[in-house]
């Protein structure tokens, strides 16, 4: 995996998934040069999708993309059997890979993580990207575990690293050749400078062209040009997590007239003060005109 992979929102309309809006968003992203899309992840509100909706969203994304870019579907769960079922379904309908979040809440040991990811890797053939996000799962995939999984299973090829500790990123990249993608927009350039390959991005939902340019510059070693784009977009990056993701990005998309719609409870609309800050930031960077 290399480049920009937007973690796409799941647009809703009147309480149901807005598939027409989903197609519109995907076309916009592809037209602006992204490497692939990641449906039904954190940004896609996967915890509030029913299992049937989860599968149908993946199916529709594969259909809409139609081979133009990669589709890496979020199929993780804190139940190994459920993650396996989602992953096998995604493989059967033609995804290019799956993204597996660390099991959350039940907090397995590192040995449990090895067995969890290993069982899924042994049961599917498509590439697997691990997803490490300790702030949400209360559990870190340790560098030694990442190295073990990469070396033991040929289809574990990448990791979305949302642990902001760059020492961890350094340890991982120093120990094995797994593709590391930043899971935080604001850490994209530091991670690429250490040997990472790109980003699973939230902000790319609204600024794909700029983010693709930034990552392309960075991967080409042109960090001065990459930094210009980073600092231009930084006011928005900061606000993407002022409230729980995907509240800010869906709010921004609604402001920009993009298909996004409402949030599903327990997520709710953005506080008015934060909404005003977001509107001002979108104006400042020239996205809202």
UniProtKB/Swiss-Prot annotation:
Residues that bind pyruvate: 43, 200
The active site consists of 131 (proton donor/acceptor), 160 (schiff-base intermediate with substrate)
Site location (Part of a proton relay during catalysis): 42, 105
Q: Is-annotated flag, keyword Amino-acid biosynthesis?
A: yes
- Which GO molecular function entries does the Swiss-Prot or TrEMBL record give? 2-dehydro-3-deoxy-phosphogluconate aldolase activity; 4-hydroxy-tetrahydrodipicolinate synthase activity
- GO CC terms in record: cytoplasm
Keywords for the protein's UniProt record, in alphabetical order: Amino-acid biosynthesis, Cytoplasm, Diaminopimelate biosynthesis, Lyase, Lysine biosynthesis, Schiff base
Tell me the enzyme class: lyase
CDD domains, sorted: DHDPS
Domain of life where this protein originates: Archaea
Catalytic reaction(s) noted: L-aspartate 4-semialdehyde + pyruvate = (2S,4S)-4-hydroxy-2,3,4,5-tetrahydrodipicolinate + H2O + H(+)
A biological-process GO annotation: diaminopimelate biosynthetic process
Catalytic activity, EC: 4.3.3.7
Where does the protein principally reside?
cytoplasm
Task performed by this protein = Catalyzes the condensation of (S)-aspartate-beta-semialdehyde [(S)-ASA] and pyruvate to 4-hydroxy-tetrahydrodipicolinate (HTPA).
Q: What is the similarity comment for this entry?
A: Belongs to the DapA family.
Outline the subunit composition. Homotetramer; dimer of dimers.
In its UniProt entry, what is this protein called?
4-hydroxy-tetrahydrodipicolinate synthase
Q: Which organism is it from?
A: Methanococcus maripaludis (strain C5 / ATCC BAA-1333)
**Which lineage?**
Archaea, Methanobacteriati, Methanobacteriota, Methanomada group, Methanococci
Name of the encoding gene: dapA
């Amino acid at each position: 995996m290399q480049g920009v992979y937007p973690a796409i929102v799941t647009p809703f309309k009147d309480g149901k998934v807005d598939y027409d809006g989903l197609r519109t968003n995907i076309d916009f992203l592809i037209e602006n040069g992204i490497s692939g899309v990641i449906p039904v992840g954190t940004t896609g509100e996967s915890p509030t999708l029913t299992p049937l909706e989860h599968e149908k969203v993946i199916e529709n994304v594969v259909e809409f993309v139609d081979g133009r870019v990669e589709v890496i579907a979020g199929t993780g769960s804190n139940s190994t059997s459920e993650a396996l079922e989602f992953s096998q379904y995604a493989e059967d309908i033609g995804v290019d890979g799956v993204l597996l979040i660390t099991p959350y809440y039940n907090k397995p040991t590192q040995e449990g993580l090895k067995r969890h990811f290993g069982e899924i890797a042994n049961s599917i053939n498509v590439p697997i990207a691990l997803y490490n996000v300790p702030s949400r799962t209360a559990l870190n995939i340790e560098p030694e575990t990442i190295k073990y999984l990469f070396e033991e299973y040929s289809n574990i090829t990448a990791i979305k690293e949302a642990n902001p500790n760059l020492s961890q990123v350094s340890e991982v990249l120093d120990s094995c050749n797994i593709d590391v993608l930043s899971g935080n927009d604001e850490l994209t350039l530091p991670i690429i400078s250490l040997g990472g390959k790109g980003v699973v991005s939230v902000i790319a939902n609204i600024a794909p062209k700029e983010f693709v340019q930034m990552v392309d510059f960075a991967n080409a070693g042109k960090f001065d040009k990459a930094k210009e784009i980073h600092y231009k977009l930084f006011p928005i990056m900061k606000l993407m997590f002022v409230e729980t993701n995907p509240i800010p990005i869906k709010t921004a998309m609604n402001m920009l007239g993009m298909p996004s719609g409402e949030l599903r409870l327990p997520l709710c609309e953005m506080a008015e003060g934060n909404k005003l800050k977001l509107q001002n930031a979108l104006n400042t960077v020239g996205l809202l005109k």
